[in-house]
Design a protein with these regions (language model features):
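Outer-membrane beta-barrel porins/channels
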Residues: 1-147
Length: 147
């Protein structure tokens, strides 16, 4: 069958500031009203939020480097966690770079590693706990072409 998991509302704010023309810093915040979603797995917990901070530096007209961090805090209570549905609070660290071939073509690369916490939940067997955790690494490559 179908499972609804709509988010009734999301608040997103962000800002970027150029410290000097070649250095930019940015911050963002997201708040999800996912606890109140129809079909939501969150029954007893709270809503989810994320905070993001990043920076970019144009080393010269060809090269750019970037770094960032994102903290995600899920609102799951123990009763909301199961083998079929779990999200774990995390902090992601990201690094990236870009090479600009000319005004029309740019190669972008990035790497992200997420550090997840553990969530211990009383297991079905008496005296046993289920421990939920995960690992995540991601690599991204893209090529921008401006027409």
């Amino acid at each position: 069958g179908k499972v609804r998991s709509d988010i009734p509302a999301i608040l997103t704010v962000g800002a970027e500031y150029s410290v000097i023309p070649s250095v930019r810093v940015a911050a963002g915040f997201h708040y999800y009203w996912d606890k109140d979603a129809k079909g939501s797995a969150i029954k007893e917990g709270s809503n989810t939020w994320e905070a993001i901070l990043g920076a970019e530096w144009d080393i010269n007209s060809k090269w750019l480097v970037s770094a960032g961090v994102q903290r995600t805090q899920y609102g799951f209570a123990d009763a909301d966690i199961s083998d079929l549905n779990y999200n774990i609070n995390s902090t992601a660290l990201c690094i990236g770079g870009a090479y600009k071939f000319n005004n029309r073509m740019k190669l972008n690369v990035g790497y992200m590693h997420s550090f997840y916490g553990e969530h211990n939940v009383a297991g079905a067997a008496a005296g046993m706990n289920d421990i939920y955790t995960r690992k995540n690494d991601a690599v991204g490559v893209s090529f921008d072409i401006r027409f």
